Every structure is written in C-alpha cells, then in structure tokens.
C-alpha cells in the first residue's frame, strides 16, 4: 500500500485519488461521531482503517482549518475506539472497498437484470423513460461498473433503507442530480413488497414550496428522498437597467436562499452543478454575473464558476453541522453530442454499446478541477463522487431521440426535435452512481448486522 503520508497529503493541486480517499476518511469519521455507539463499537474496517489515517491528519496543508471550529472536529476525530472482541466480523469485500478508488474502473458486460425493470417505476419522468418512448434496444442496461482495484456490492435497497431509517436525503442541484434522485427513489422502491408504501411529498401538506421541491417518503422506514432544483447553487436574480428594463443576473456571492432552510439540517445532502454553466448566457458572461450591486459588463465563465463554488463552500462551512449532516458533491456527468450542441443539431442516436477502448479519455472538465481545489480547502469534509470518467464511455446511455414519444404519424423520432445527449435513460447509468453511493455508506461504517444498520448512519 502506498505511504499513507503521500496518499493523504493535500497539496495545492490535489489529485482525484487524494480527494477521494480523503473524503472517504472524513465520511467514515462523520458516521462514527454522529452514531449511537451504545450497542456497537466501530467495525473492524472503520476502526483499523481510520486509526491508520488519524496520523495523516498532521500532514494536511491547513490543519487549523479542521480544528479551529470549536469542538466539532475534535469530537469526531476522537470518536474512533478499539474494536471489541465480540464485535461482528467484516466481510472481505467491504475491507477491500476501503482502500479502493471506486471511481477508477471500466464498464463490463453483465447479463443480470437491472435493479428495477424498464417501465415499472412510475416516478421516472417521461424525458428519462426511454423504454416508454420506444427505445428498442436494451443492451445499454447490460453493463456494470467495475473498479480496477476491487469489486463493489450489488445495490441492496432493503439494507440501504435500513441505513436510512428516520433520515432525510436531499439532492440539490440541476437536472443531472434529478436524474440520480429519480434513480435512487426507483431503486429503493423496487425492493418493497408493498409499493404503495411510498408517498409523494406535496408542498402544501408539508409546509414546503410547491415549485422546485420534489420528495418521496418511504413510510415504513420514516425516511424521505428529496430533490431541490438549484442548477447553479447560487441565487438567480434580476436587476433593472438604466432603461427600466428587468434582466436576469446570477448572484455569485449569494447561495440560493429560498431552499437552504429545507436542507441545511438534512442527514445527507448531495450537491451538484455544472451543465447550466455551459449555456450561452453563462458562457458568454455579458452583463449577467453580479456581486453585491455590481453587474459585471463581462466576466469569464471560469472565474464566475470559481466565485460561485467558493460561495457554496463558505455557506456549507458556516451553516452545515458536520456532526449531523454528511455532504456529498457529484462531479460532472459527460455529454456526447456529435455534429453540434444540444440546441444546434447535436446527435448521439444509434449508440448501443459503451466505448470499449480503455485508453480512451475524454476532456476532463475544468469545472471539476475548480471543485476539487475548493473542496480541499474546506473545513467541512465533503465526499466527492467523481463520476466524470465512468460517464466518458457511456455514449449509449443517453435518451437521444427517445426523450419523448415518437410522432404518432410515423415520422422519424429525430425529425424536428433536439436530441438529449446529456441526461441518462432510466433505468440506466445513474443506477451505477447510486450503487457507488450505497457502497460508500457500507464502507463508512462496515457491514454490521441488519438490526444495527439503522442506528449507525
């Protein structure tokens, strides 16, 4: 194994592996600090793994950023206790996961059924429901993600629901996060004997806003899986120009205010932002970006994005109670447009298999380099789900022309419509993201008996 000092030394430009392993380390400590330890001490995988890593805390670039926030960090750093003799043993698969970068791997053929069958989950939006919209092939469902250094467990919805008993999971971000949210709801629902025990959360019934908030409650487990629309994470606003005309701006110095009270106290918050920063007005940056009363005449999108991510990070560090809430950030999901962009004739139809060449590498998004740098400087540990590489290869997984039903007149489905080469069919690729989320939660506290899972998250 690599020298732990080198693995966990955060430099000014940390590697993706460093970000991953460091995030996993702190997530493990979070789960221990906020868990009830009256019945179980930390599992072998957590106590042995984290006890080795505790010494690495001395080698972080800014250790004061972790200790200056009063007692929060001290508490979770000191919560790791030795394993008791009568503690359950941990399976070798979970042990293996603890030292593995699960986001570095390849897609392999797998003829097993998806976690939920096409057409069987009523919560999939039509624009992601490729089966309903007439997609004839199913080969894109016959591949699973295989990390290079380990095997990941198959998604077990019953076990995950037990881990989430009494908890709130909130996805905050753009429609790619909504893609992942719908996938998780459907994956969990598929394991229920009584599918009617899932209820839609309605704003008027729960004192929640009707616009931009969506949620489902798993009644028998008293847990909810919610989505909040916040494509930039920062506040969309408007100003009145010198001619008295209102125009949209994006407040780079202000988190989206209307929704933060909903998720700041959630148990798990999963953020993302990326694709909306590639649209024309954000990319051009003319008279659109605002800080305080200043509207920039022109601002490069990279600088604007960096300011926005710092605003998000500052809000998280100031408002999230890290002994209660675990924070995730989902990386940039690859698009695969040919011959144009989403609004200029770009295409991806006809793709039925992933790219098989393992040496293929897409262009690593500059946005993720910004996110990685900012996360490395935060005092709140953030688990970074770097899904960029695993989506590079999946040219076959997009709705393309099957983002809506074919014309009943028999016209070609591609005629007169733009193709969706950014989002993903469901079931499909986002199910693998949630499999990695599930694996992460398993590693962070070990595979203890089912009866104890609910109290350990």
Swiss-Prot record:
Q: What are the entry keywords? A: Membrane, Signal-anchor, Transmembrane, Transmembrane helix
The protein's name in its UniProt record: Protein trichome birefringence-like 4
Homology family: Belongs to the PC-esterase family. TBL subfamily.
Q: Which GO terms describe its molecular function?
A: O-acetyltransferase activity
Its biological purpose is as follows:
May act as a bridging protein that binds pectin and other cell wall polysaccharides. Probably involved in maintaining esterification of pectins. May be involved in the specific O-acetylation of cell wall polymers.
Miscellaneous note, as given in the UniProt record, is: Contains 2 motifs that are conserved in esterases, but it is unlikely that this protein belongs to the catalytically active pectin esterases.
Q: Where is this motif: DCXHWCLPGXXDXWN motif?
A: 420-434
What is the protein's membrane topology class?
Answer: Single-pass membrane protein
The subcellular location is:
Membrane
Q: Which residues form a coiled coil?
A: none
Cellular compartments per GO CC: membrane
The residue ranges crossing the membrane are 19-37
A Pfam family that this protein carries is: PMR5N
Q: Where is this motif: GDS motif?
A: 173-175
Tell me if Transmembrane helix is a UniProt keyword of this record.
yes
């Amino acid at each position: 194994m690599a020298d732990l000092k080198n693995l966990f030394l955060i430099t000014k430009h940390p590697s993706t592996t460093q970000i991953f392993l460091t995030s996993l380390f702190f997530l493990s400590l979070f789960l221990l600090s906020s868990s009830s330890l009256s019945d179980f001490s930390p599992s072998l995988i957590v106590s042995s793994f984290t006890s080795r890593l505790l010494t690495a805390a001395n080698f972080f670039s800014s250790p004061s950023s972790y200790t200056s926030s009063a007692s929060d960090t001290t508490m979770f750093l000191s919560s790791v206790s030795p394993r008791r003799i009568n503690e359950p043993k941990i399976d070798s698969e979970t042990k293996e996961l603890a030292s593995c970068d699960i986001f570095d791997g390849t897609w392999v053929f797998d003829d097993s059924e998806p976690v939920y069958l096409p057409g069987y989950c009523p919560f999939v939006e039509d624009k992601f429901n490729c089966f309903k919209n007439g997609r004839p092939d199913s080969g894109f469902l016959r591949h699973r993600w295989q990390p290079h250094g380990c095997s990941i467990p198959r998604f077990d919805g019953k076990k995950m629901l037990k881990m989430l008993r009494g908890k709130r999971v909130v996805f905050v971000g753009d429609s790619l996060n909504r893609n992942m949210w719908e996938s998780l709801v459907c994956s969990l629902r598929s394991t229920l004997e009584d599918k009617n025990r899932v209820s839609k959360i309605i704003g008027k019934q729960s004192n929640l806003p009707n616009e931009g908030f969506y949620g489902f409650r798993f009644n028998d487990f008293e847990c909810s899986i919610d989505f909040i629309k916040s494509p930039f994470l920062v506040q969309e606003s408007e100003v009145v120009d010198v001619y008295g005309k209102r125009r949209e701006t994006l407040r780079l110095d202000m988190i989206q205010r209307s929704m933060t009270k909903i998720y700041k106290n959630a148990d798990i918050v999963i953020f993302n932002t990326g694709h909306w920063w590639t649209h024309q007005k954000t990319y051009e940056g003319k008279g659109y970006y605002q800080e305080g009363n200043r509207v920039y005449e022109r601002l490069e999108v990279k600088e604007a994005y960096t300011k926005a991510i710092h605003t998000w990070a500052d809000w998280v560090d100031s408002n999230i109670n890290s002994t209660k809430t675990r924070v995730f950030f989902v990386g940039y999901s690859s698009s695969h447009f040919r011959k144009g962009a989403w609004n200029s004739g770009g295409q991806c139809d006809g793709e039925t298999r992933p790219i098989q060449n393992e040496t293929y590498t897409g262009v690593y998004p500059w946005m993720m380099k910004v996110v990685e740098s900012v996360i490395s400087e935060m005092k709140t540990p953030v688990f970074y789900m770097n899904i960029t590489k695993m989506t590079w290869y999946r040219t076959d997984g997009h709705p393309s022309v099957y983002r809506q039903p074919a014309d009943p007149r028999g016209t070609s489905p591609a005629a007169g419509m733009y193709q969706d080469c950014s989002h993903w069919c469901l079931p499909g690729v986002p199910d693998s993201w949630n499999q990695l989320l599930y694996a992460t939660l398993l590693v962070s506290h070990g595979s203890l008996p089912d009866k104890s899972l609910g109290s350990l998250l």
